[in-house]
Each structure stands twice: as structure tokens, then as C-alpha cells.
Amino acid sequence: MKAKTLTATLALILLAFAQADYDVASYCQLVQSGTKLPSLDSCQNYYTCVSNGLPTLSSCSSGYVFNKDSQQCVPTGSFNCFFGVANPCQNQDKKFVPSAKQCNEWHYCLAGAIAGTGTCKEGQIFNFAKQSCVYGECSNTGNNILDSPNLSVCQIMPNGIYFGDNKNCSTWHKCSGMEEKKGTCPNGDNFDPTYASCVPSNMPACSRIQNPPSTGVVSGPPSTSPCSLGTVVGDLTSCSVYYKCENATRSNSTIWNTYTCSGQFFDVISKQCTSTNQARTLKGCNRCQFTTGSMYWVNAVDPQCSEYFTCSNGLETKSTASTCGAGNFFNEDLQYCMIGNSTVGQYAQTHGACENYTCNPNTRLCNLVTATNTTSSHR
């Protein structure tokens, strides 16, 4: 490797990453149904993209790893994978390997151990096959991977396939090794991931990019005035709208005044505007509000945390929730069902829909089921 290409900082280091996975559902919107994408947590794990459904998580059997390019499990050692490994230099000697942190970093290996680490020049990323830095950008398509690491989209997408863009309807991408090619459909056409090709702009190929509509639909307060002064309740339809019983300005009576949380939901327990994932909302209000794209999933109000809604452009695709099944729970952050529920208590501490609370359907007043509820301590 040429010294002018890499800037080395030699040091003996121990590398142990707890790798966060990325927003798989967003990437699945850019490819054909059935495409498999790698997990960043383990070389054995991968996701299968499903049309109008949650990506499904699978795992290769012992002794095998997932190869994103062949789209199948292959024997360990026949494919170089560096995701979720404690030591990326294992079984590597006198070679450069990619850093699991971000795509423009590399490590130099000696006798299976990290002997040095460095960073490519600005505008370059590390290419393991070429053992050098090549021109490219980390997350340069705008399809940003969530929560570190900052990777190149070509570390996620299979080689040789055309895939879409989540910001421009007419743009397509294609990976060749670590090198990404980008183009635009001619004549104002749009790129349709379903067919992996350009189609006329009048075909419904771009719902993944459309902004969520503002329906303006609300249920109204729970009763006509007068109301009990100081009472604050949520709306049955819009999770961001709430009503406060206040003194009327032109009479001695009380009336319901309407308020709206900006980009947040109304929390029916704390009576405050709260982030959408933390807010405890009325069952039945639109928890898909503020989501973007043609496919996204959110927790439904469910103390077991197994139910979820499918969202499209800020709206629920159906009035009834889907379920992960008994004993499992839906993780809105990772966008898939978690097998087992051993960590659901910890998850519920920051995801209000999974807390155990009840609401009177007539008054809309809500309370935690028990005062010692473990999920209420963070409020």
C-alpha cells in the first residue's frame, strides 16, 4: 500500500465493538423483494427484504457466514466479513483490513493482531480487495446508516444490482466492489426498485420519497363544555393533538381549547409533549404520524409490546395492528420483531406504547397500572 494513499498511525490496540444495526427497512425500499442484506451485528446474520412487510432476520448455521454478493451462506474462510467481530485481524497476516467503525479507516494486521490503524485521504474509502484506498464517500448516497458506524452503501448492497435512492425518484445506484456508480433515468422517468429499472413517471414507483400528508383529522374533545377546569386529555385520532379545559374569555363557564405538539406526541400520563417513541398515547390515535417513506413500522399501544402498525407516508395502512406473536416483542428502533421478551422491560422504559397503563374511554384520563411500574421511573 502506497504511503501517499494512507496516513498511518501505528499503535497496538484491542478492538471490541458492539455494532449497532442500521435502518434495514429503509434500505429494503430501494431493492427488489427477496434481496438479502447483511446484519452489522454478526457475519452470520442477514435480513430478507419482503414486499410490504418487515424485513425478516435469519442466521447462517455454525461454520458459515453470509455473503451479500452471492446472496447465500458460505463456509467461514471463503468470504471475508468484518462485521461484529472482536478482532478483524483474525487469520490475517501482513494485510490491510477495513475498520468496522467507518469505511475510510483501515487496520494493518501482523500474525493475526492489529499492528496499526489509519485513515484514507478525504474523498476516499478503503477497498479490501484492492488492499488500498479508492475514490468514494462514506454514506455518499444520502442513505445514511443510523447510529454509527458510518459505512459506505456498497458495504450493505450486493454487487452488480441496480437499486434506488431515498431522496430522488429518478436516481439509481450500482455497486462494483466498493466503488459506487450513480445515474439518472432519462426523459424524466423514475427508477422503480420493483423492476430494478426506469419506468414512466406516471407509474407509482416513488412513494418511498413522498412526504407524509397532513390529514388535519381530529376527533375533538371528549365532551361538550362546560368541562372540569384544568383537565388535559389527548385526541383519539391524532397523537399530537390535546385539549385543555380552561376558563372561557367571554363567560364564567369553561371550554376545551385545542393544542398541538410540534413533531411530538401528547403523553397521556405526564400531560406533556414528548418524543414519539417515548410518549404514552391513547390507543387508536395515529402512531404513524411524522413517519416518512412508503414503509415503516411503529409500536402499537400494547403492554406486551408484541403489536405494531405498518406505516405508509405518515398513515397506518390498516386499522388493526399486526403482531410478532406471543412471547416476542416489536423493536421500533431496529424495525423488526425480537425473538423472546427477556429485554422488553428495558425497551419499554424508553418506548411509551409498551408501558402498562389504562385509559377511561369516556373521560380519556389515564393511569399507570401500578405505582411501582418499573417503566415509569424514567419519566
Curated annotation (Swiss-Prot):
* Signal sequence, start to end: 1-20
What are the disulfide bonds?
A: C60-C73, C120-C133, C185-C198, C324-C337
Residues with an annotated glycan are: N150, N168, N247, N252, N341, N356, N373
Q: Where is the Chitin-binding type-2 domain?
A: 25-83, 86-143, 151-208, 224-283, 285-356
Q: How is it modified after translation?
A: Glycosylated.
Task: Give the Gene Ontology MF terms in alphabetical order.
Answer: chitin binding
Q: Provide the alphabetized UniProt keywords.
A: Chitin-binding, Disulfide bond, Glycoprotein, Repeat, Signal
Among its keywords, does the record have Repeat? Answer: yes
Give the GO cellular component terms, alphabetically: extracellular region
Q: Sorted alphabetically, which InterPro entries does this protein's record hold?
A: Chitin-bd_dom, Chitin-bd_dom_sf
Q: In which tissues is it expressed?
A: Larval peritrophic membrane.
**Role this protein plays:** Binds chitin and may bind related oligosaccharide structures.
What this protein is called in its record is Peritrophin-48
Its lineage opens with: Eukaryota, Metazoa, Ecdysozoa, Arthropoda, Hexapoda
